[in-house]
């Protein structure tokens, strides 16, 4: 607002546009406001989730996230993710302690035949959509210093890992371009030049619904990584490889030095 209470963006027509980031920043400065039960209960679906968030009970939140996604309860999934974000849990902690563990609980249910492949995919898609909404608070723009390309492999169906990478990079000040699933990168040099890419992030999971790590596809995936890395190296673009799928590509770690598991 104009008196500086909560930051906002004013449009040419004079309208004020707020994002979750604006409100989040306000709560950072005004601790008493963030502790108000009235405000919390207005923004979060019920008191139990609010209490878990305030106590940083990440394990319980991860289980609630998994259960809500399995039940296709999108409202609760959004409440857990957006509520944690609004209470100033940084995105790295949110993903490492709540979202990724919640997704792995869904994967375990699939392994134990509690869920079908379709049900697990629906569940993870709900979590992915809620996570991706955090990008709205950090849009791409000329004010960002660097640009990153997040690469999901052609046969890799779940987008959650690459979406989490995108959210974190945006919060680090990057413009981020996400290829999504089944993307054909085509002339990578042209993409890097046109978008002025400084960093490429690969993400490969090893879940049952990920076809990039099945049979002959694992060789195809390894060849694709090697090809992209070679092109990026020639153009002096930094490369990071993430996800549990890296354990299935042992030669990659010898080539790409910067890696992460989750």
Place the predicted regions along the sequence by residue.
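C-terminal regulatory/effector modules of DNA-binding transcriptional regulators
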Residues: 113-116, 122, 126-262
């Amino acid at each position: 607002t104009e008196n500086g209470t909560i930051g906002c963006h004013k449009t040419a027509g004079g309208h004020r546009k707020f994002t979750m980031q604006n409100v989040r920043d306000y709560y950072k400065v005004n601790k008493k406001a963030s502790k108000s039960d009235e405000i919390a209960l207005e923004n979060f679906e019920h008191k139990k989730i609010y209490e878990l968030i305030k106590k940083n009970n990440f394990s319980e939140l991860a289980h609630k996230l998994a259960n809500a996604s399995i039940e296709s309860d999108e409202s609760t999934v959004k409440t857990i993710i957006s509520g944690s974000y609004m209470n100033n849990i940084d995105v790295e902690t949110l993903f490492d302690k709540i979202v990724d563990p919640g997704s792995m609980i869904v994967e375990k249910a699939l392994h134990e035949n509690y869920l079908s492949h379709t049900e697990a995919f629906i569940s993870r898609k709900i979590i992915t959509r809620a996570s991706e909404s955090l990008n709205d608070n950090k849009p791409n723009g000329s004010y960002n210093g660097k640009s990153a390309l997040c690469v999901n492999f052609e046969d890799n169906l779940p987008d959650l890992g690459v979406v989490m990478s995108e959210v974190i990079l945006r919060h680090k000040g990057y413009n981020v371009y996400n290829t999504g699933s089944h993307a054909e990168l085509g002339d990578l040099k042209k993409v890097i030049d046109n978008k002025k890419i400084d960093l490429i992030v690969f993400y490969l999971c090893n879940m049952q619904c990920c076809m990039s790590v099945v049979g002959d596809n694992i060789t195809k995936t390894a060849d694709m990584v090697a090809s992209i890395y070679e092109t990026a190296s020639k153009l002096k673009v930094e490369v990071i490889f993430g996800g549990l799928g890296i354990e299935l590509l042992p030669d990659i770690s010898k080539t790409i030095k910067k890696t992460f598991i989750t």
